[in-house]
Amino acid sequence: MATTAQQSPQPVAGKRKGKSQFLPAKRARRGDAGGPRQLEPGLQGILITCNMNERKCVEEAYSLLNEYGDDMYGPEKFIDKDQQPSGSEGEDDDAEAALKKEVGDIKASTEKRLRRFQSVESGANNVVFIRTLGIEPEKLVHHILQDMYKTKKKKTRVILRMLPISGTCKAFLEDMKKYAETFLEPWFKAPNKGTFQIVYKSRNNSHMNREEVIKELAGIVGSLNSENKVDLTNPEYTVVVEIIKAVCCLSVVKDYVLFRKYNLQEVVKSAKDSQPHPKLGNGKEAKLEPDSKLSQSDPPEGNQVAPESIEELGQTEPGSETQAGSEGDAKPEPESQVSEVPKTNENELS
């Protein structure tokens, strides 16, 4: 009798262990199909902020990106497993060559299964990161915003901002400096030049100093070409710095002011405004191309706040900047370089 009483709890204990073993697997579903499962150095993609509904945000992002991705790059093509590339049987004579061929076939088949857009864990609340493959995220996002600005059609509900990320690196000052020296060359290295501003946002990171990062990046831009100048009113280029935990996301975008900090909700509102937009002037319609630049003579969209001091470029600091903090609940986003547009959106989140 005593032995049977002692054995009865064992199946119950076994079931509990079985459940705990399967729980972590549910969190790993976002980065399937052989790709990375979380934001890490060496990725390209699109950083998207939302309003407390990440699952719905991912669904909207896939729908929107696939629609415009097919328009720009054509429909996505897939290859069945039976059609995976394979070498000739004659190469299998050597064991080492056969092993290399097998590894190459596995790698090639994995690349074929990777989707054009794949959601990965961003590491911050209300933030979604969509890894991209085989496309230029900055051109795709600009095309989306340009079309929404012209058509005045609202295509998303929970997506707020959509920022292209052209490169990622480790979020340490020395790593960022080394990476940025090469990353910024296509836009700012002579003979290329232009006016610029730097916007900075940090989430779940306490070891990076905003002032140091902006100062170092501005110095790199100035060293690439002395004719690169800071313009906080209407810059040709905006250097976007998004730090999440130990990963730094970088991009250089155009029409950042016109497209309301790349906020999809605000772009539609500004396009629906019956009055002439401040950037258009005298009621003239803005003519934007995929790689267009805003005219330097356009008036400012709002009262701009000056950034930290950039001694290399002759800028001054008013000392009134708001320190970027870690990610939390839904709050308006404090950009480091550009003040809020007079008509702000209460749903614009970090």
Swiss-Prot record:
Q: Which domain of life is it from?
A: Eukaryota
Question: What PROSITE patterns does the record tag this protein with?
Answer: THUMP
Locate the region Disordered.
1-42, 75-96, 270-350
Q: Where is the composition biased (Basic and acidic residues)?
A: 270-292
Annotated positions of the Phosphoserine modification: S8, S86, S88, S119, S270
**What are the UniProt keywords, alphabetically?**
Acetylation, Phosphoprotein
Question: Which N-terminal residues, if any, form the signal peptide?
Answer: none
Described purpose of this protein according to its UniProt entry: Functions as a tRNA-binding adapter to mediate NAT10-dependent tRNA acetylation modifying cytidine to N4-acetylcytidine (ac4C).
- GO MF terms, alphabetically ordered: RNA binding
Which taxonomic lineage is given here?
Eukaryota, Metazoa, Chordata, Craniata, Vertebrata
The record's similarity note reads:
Belongs to the THUMPD1 family.
In this UniProt entry, the residues modified to N-acetylalanine are A2
GO biological process terms held by the UniProt record: tRNA modification
The name on file for this protein is THUMP domain-containing protein 1
Q: Where is the THUMP domain?
A: 147-254
Subunit structure as annotated in this protein's UniProt entry: Interacts with NAT10. Binds tRNA.
The biased composition feature labelled Polar residues covers: 1-10
